């Protein structure tokens, strides 16, 4: 998508969801601000680096990159480690960017809400360290604000990282309690069965991706996704409103 943001600059912003190597230079022609989001695919790291290499080549100096929280901590999770490699490239090559680092998306619950209601369990193995899940709508709004901030600035702005988290840090039992309240009957958290989790995922995704997700879940349990002090306040200041809560999201998708 291309759009004009500011009459003074008459510039264009490129939203890039997938990368076609042969058309990168054409796609980036005349673009001043880039939003880079790469799918979880086997060559995600290569795609991201090539996109940024071409962006640097054509002179794009305003970038917003969607990474992931704790990319530097979850070193054995492929789609986390790849994103951290991209972050390192951005920093060491001196690119002017906002790196957004979202936690686990609340929106993933869409895929398991029927299982929760049907079997009376919360099946995601998220453990008891705590996960600060965030609504994708909040991610999108913050990303848009950062794109506009960079696009309309007088010059390229320095590198910054923003953790994107929800207002509550919830454990597996906490989430089960939320669903119990929303559904009006008991929902339990059965604990972690990583082998079973991987096997279930292999029914609808490639085996390499299922293992990637299993290893991620194992790190949920050992490390959690806990925000840093001040993260929630920073986001609510940016948005000018409270972050969306997990309970409200669960109630919404139940209908």
Q: What is each model feature region?
A:
Residues 1, 29-31, 40-42, 49, ...:
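Oxidoreductase cofactor-interface core, primarily capturing Rossmann-like NAD(P)-dependent enzymes
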Residues 7-32:
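Conserved Rossmann-fold cofactor-binding substructure of NAD(P)-dependent oxidoreductases
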Residues 1-7:
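NAD(P)-binding Rossmann-fold cofactor-contacting core
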């Amino acid at each position: 998508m291309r759009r004009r943001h500011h009459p003074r600059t008459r510039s264009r912003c490129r939203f890039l969801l997938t990368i076609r190597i042969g058309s990168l230079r054409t796609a980036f022609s005349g673009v001043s601000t880039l939003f880079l989001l790469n799918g979880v695919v086997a060559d995600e790291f290569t795609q991201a680096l090539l996109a940024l290499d071409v962006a640097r080549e054509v002179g794009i100096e305003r970038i917003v990159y969607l990474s992931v929280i704790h990319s530097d901590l979850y070193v054995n999770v492929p789609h986390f480690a790849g994103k951290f490699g991209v972050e390192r490239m951005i920093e060491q090559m001196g690119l002017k960017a906002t790196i957004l680092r979202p936690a686990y998306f609340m929106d993933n619950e869409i895929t398991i809400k029927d299982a929760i209601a049907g079997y009376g369990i919360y099946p995601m193995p998220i453990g008891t360290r705590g996960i600060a899940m965030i609504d994708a709508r909040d991610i999108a709004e913050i990303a848009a604000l950062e794109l506009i901030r960079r696009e309309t600035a007088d010059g390229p702005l320095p590198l910054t990282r923003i953790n994107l988290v929800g207002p509550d840090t919830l454990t597996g039992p906490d989430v089960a309690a939320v669903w119990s309240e929303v559904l009006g009957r008991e929902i339990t958290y059965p604990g972690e069965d990583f082998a079973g989790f991987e096997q279930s995922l292999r029914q609808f995704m490639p085996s390499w991706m299922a293992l990637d997700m299993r290893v991620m879940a194992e790190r949920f349990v050992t490390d959690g996704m806990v925000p840093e002090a001040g993260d929630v306040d920073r986001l609510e200041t940016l948005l000018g409103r409270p972050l969306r809560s997990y309970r409200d999201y669960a109630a919404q998708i139940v209908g």
